[in-house]
């Protein structure tokens, strides 16, 4: 996916590449079935084996292309994803690598080189859209730069692929190692090429930022913020459905209840009130007018700090100002909390709003899974929408460019959310994810108890003791195994979480004992009989604790 958005490639496959295409289609189909299979968890060995087999085919494909075409340095470059030779094989291969990358994340191998492919693809799309929009700040770029540096370190590592040392006599492991050694150069070239492309895109964006005079940076930041606010306001609503649409959908609902029972007929989740739009729009318009008044007679912006005019960056700032005025005009004509665009653009707008809303809901939990939340499908949908553009614009018969910037913003926003979801992935295998979720919940509850002042007696902690004991009993000699007897990724994280929960629990118990002793001392000074009763009660409370510790 090295081509810029909207660029089309010939899909004619040379005869010598047809066998590889058929193999990749089979792999893509099997991976698609795998992510729909909810009966068993992914196995890291299976994922690693499939990945190495695909790399072997990639190596064969590279050799075929090098033998068929003149290359400056045949041994030092790869022709995979070459813009000139791009065909259907490359498109299917990209799908396979995307799926495999998500599989590596699913089995908890987040910090392995293959797992970075999906992240790099999303960063690549995000950077291309930021470049087209010309609306970004250092705050937008700094997280991307940090992530690219992290990926660089992973790719630079000699042993980028994880080693499995559970059983040195395992034939499958030896097979993986042999394949890895043969494919190491090809894997390295592919990832480095994709990483270099992202870095080049980033450097272009960083260079654009430096074109603006530092004294105008505050003005630029405010204009960016206003424009983002306007775009966000436009993208937060969906056109209200008419009564006839609702009646039609009611009939469809009866026929397809199983498929659509989770969706509202009126799509209320997308709607915002007209009052809200007007209120937010009024605030942003006032901020825009205030900034606009900070210009000289010739229309050049002054520095907010020194009140001096700097020449460098004036055209960029005035361009941002014009964009903001266009968006204000669009929002002023909104009806029923929604935006009506060109008939050719409206379906794209509706589709992007749906995708964005779904992805934003996922951000609440900061968790995705390969089967329950298929990020690959969302990436494919976004790519399909992106590829409809011609010369950066969505095709329409109208000469009015209204809506183009809004659609691009929605695309960019969706890519950004997918990027955040990928980065929020924990290096824990899906086989251990239920245990990880339970431990995280127990930890959160214990921390909340501690924050609210602890408990009055140890009995209140018994449910947490029992839960932690049951989770601790799932280990065998300190290791969590899956149902097939394998050792999934994420052992360190789970053991650290379990130990932290026990530590917090112990602190709460100590605090509860101190409270009980203080209460006993206070009662004893008033009434000796009550004091003896309190001591007896305290000693009774301690018995279950000793049983738990012995257990």
UniProtKB/Swiss-Prot annotation:
Involved in bleomycin tolerance with links to DNA repair and/or proteasome function. Pfam families: DUF2408 (PF10303). This is Cu(2+) suppressing and bleomycin sensitive protein 1. The gene is CUB1. Disruption phenotype: Leads to sensitivity to bleomycin. Bleomycin sensitivity is even increased when CUB1 deletion is combined with proteasome mutants including PRE9 or UMP1 disruptions. Suppresses the copper tolerance induced by the proteasome subunit PRE9 disruption. Leads to synthetic sickness with deletion of RAD6 on media containing bleomycin, but not hydroxyurea (HU). It is found in: Cytoplasm; Nucleus. One of its GO terms (cellular component) is nucleus. Residues 513-551 are annotated as: Disordered. Phosphorylated by PKA in vitro. Monomer.
């Amino acid at each position: 996916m090295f081509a810029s958005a909207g660029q089309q490639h010939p899909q004619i496959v040379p005869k010598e590449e047809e066998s590889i295409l058929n193999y990749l289609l089979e792999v893509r189909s099997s991976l698609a079935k795998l992510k729909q299979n909810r009966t068993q968890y992914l196995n890291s060995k299976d994922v690693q084996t499939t990945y190495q087999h695909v790399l072997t085919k990639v190596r064969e494909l590279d050799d075929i292309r090098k033998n068929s075409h003149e290359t400056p340095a045949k041994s030092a470059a790869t022709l995979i994803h070459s813009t000139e030779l791009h065909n259907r094989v490359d498109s299917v291969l990209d799908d396979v690598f995307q799926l495999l990358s998500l599989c590596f994340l699913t089995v908890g191998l987040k910090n392995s080189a293959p797992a970075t492919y999906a992240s790099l693809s999303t960063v690549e799309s995000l950077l291309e859209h930021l470049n087209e929009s010309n609306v970004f700040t250092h705050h937008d770029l700094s997280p991307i730069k940090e992530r690219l540096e992290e990926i660089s370190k992973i790719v630079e590592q000699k042993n980028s692929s994880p080693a499995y040392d559970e059983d040195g006599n395992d034939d499958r492991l030896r097979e993986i190692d042999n394949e890895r050694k043969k494919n190491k150069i090809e894997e390295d070239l592919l990832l480095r090429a994709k990483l270099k492309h992202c870095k080049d895109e980033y450097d272009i964006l960083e260079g654009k930022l430096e074109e603006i005079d530092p004294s105008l940076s505050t003005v630029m930041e405010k204009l960016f913020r206003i424009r983002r606010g306007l775009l966000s306001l436009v993208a937060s609503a969906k056109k209200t459905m008419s009564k006839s649409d609702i009646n039609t959908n009611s009939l469809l609902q009866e026929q397809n209840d199983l498929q659509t029972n989770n969706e509202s007929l009126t799509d209320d989740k997308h709607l915002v009130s007209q009052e809200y739009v007007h209120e937010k729009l009024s605030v942003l318009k006032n901020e825009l007018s205030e900034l606009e008044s900070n210009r000289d007679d010739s229309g050049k912006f002054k520095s907010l700090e020194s009140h001096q005019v700097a020449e460098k960056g004036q055209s960029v700032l005035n361009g941002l100002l014009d964009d903001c005025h266009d968006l204000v005009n669009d929002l002023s004509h909104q009806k029923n909390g929604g935006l009506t665009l060109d008939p050719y653009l409206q379906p794209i707008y509706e589709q992007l709003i749906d995708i964005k809303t779904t992805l934003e809901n996922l951000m609440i939990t900061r968790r995705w899974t390969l089967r329950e939340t298929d990020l690959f499908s969302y990436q494919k949908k976004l790519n399909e929408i992106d590829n409809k553009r011609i010369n950066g614009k969505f095709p329409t018969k109208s000469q009015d460019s209204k809506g183009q910037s809004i659609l691009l913003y929605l695309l960019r926003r969706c890519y950004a959310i997918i990027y955040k979801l990928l980065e929020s992935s924990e290096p824990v295998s899906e086989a251990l994810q239920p245990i990880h979720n339970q431990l995280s919940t127990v930890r959160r509850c214990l921390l909340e108890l501690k924050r609210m002042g602890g408990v009055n007696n140890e009995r209140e902690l018994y449910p947490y003791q029992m839960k932690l004991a049951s989770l601790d009993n799932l280990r065998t000699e300190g290791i969590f195994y899956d149902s097939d007897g394998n050792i999934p990724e994420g052992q360190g994280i789970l053991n650290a979480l379990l130990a932290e929960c026990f530590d917090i629990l112990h602190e709460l118990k100590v605090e509860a004992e101190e409270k009980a002793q203080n209460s006993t001392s206070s009662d004893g000074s008033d009434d000796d009989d009550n004091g003896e009763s309190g001591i007896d009660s305290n000693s009774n409370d301690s018995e279950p604790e000793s049983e738990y510790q012995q257990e």
